[in-house]
Amino acid sequence: MASDPLELLEEPTLARVAQRIVDEAQATAGAPAALYVGDLDGRSLRRVTGDDGLPDQLESTQLIGPEIPASHAAALALAMPQGATVLPLTLRGRALSVLVFSGPPTGDVGALVARSAAALELAERYTDLLASARRHRACSAAAELQQDLMPPRIARLEGAEVACSILPAYDVGGDWIDHSAMAGGGWLGVADAVGKGPQASAISAIALGAYRATRRGGGDLADAAQSIHAAVLALELPDIFMSAVLASWDGPSSTLTWLRCGHPAPMVWHADRGLRELEGGDGPVLGLERLDPPSEAASATIAPGELVVLVSDGVLERTAPGGEPFGEDGLRLALAGMHAPSAIAAASAVLQGVATTYDGPLRDDASVVVLAPV
């Protein structure tokens, strides 16, 4: 048996790491097992390899995109076949995969589970095995690029937790979301490029590159807006632009600072006070030569129990069969249904609300980023 994650990675073909984990799990537990990953929509677990007697797919609402919050692990049992045991492979507060046993393990698999979580995350840099299993239908080139640029869906900044995801339209690819921990806090953002398909995806990728380069180079939010503006202009394509909310978080003071660039405003939710927009920091979309990017950021203290919610227009404009948009009323209903408000619960509620508003395919990517002080 492998004694550490790196030993698992010594497999000559890293596509076999998943099968090796299942083989060792079955040998240790004395029960048939299979490895599952979450799909990109966050609505089911899909079998990668293992016992054919277990289902190919298990419906579940416990995911944020393809990631499973550690806090939701116990509820995964509700999606399992009768008598089955589920063990999430958890790393840094979230699981990217789970082991499912057809019966109770008779041996101790705890050490294997801990090693396997790290090994699989490292192996993903070298094999598409897990990435392929997460897709329930083919992605366009634009949507594939979008997924490759995604940050972790669940993370911690100093003084806050972050949960985020994009419910993909699979052939659009113009949205991006991002976050990064920094000393004392971090950055987060959501953006949407005009149009659909490869052009929107290319604009989005260039803009995200400019955003990250500015952040990593020590710039501030105004610098980031200017960098995105210049990068989109440099493409020299007619009538292209990008909307965005760019924000930073200071943990010690519990302060959010933001710029709103022609995008839906950042919002704050509180169970007793409802949903409100944050005012200020406004400016035009980025990438149009006749318009200057905003330079005056706004700030607000985020109180305990409040949640910062950033969304793209794909959330607000998702329509029911009768033509009614999801809108802010849909956001309010989704957030009001949380049992215990948190970044993870809020992101999950919004994504589930958008997905269940109408059973038809998404016409636009639906993106959400939620920050909660802790």
Task: Go through each PLM region and give its residues.
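Acidic loop->beta-strand submotif enriched in PP2C/PPM serine/threonine phosphatases
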Residues: G83, M242, G280-G322, G360-R363
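Amphipathic alpha-helical "output/dimerization" segments
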Residues: G103-E121, I206-G209
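Regulatory cytosolic signal-relay segments
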Residues: R115-G173
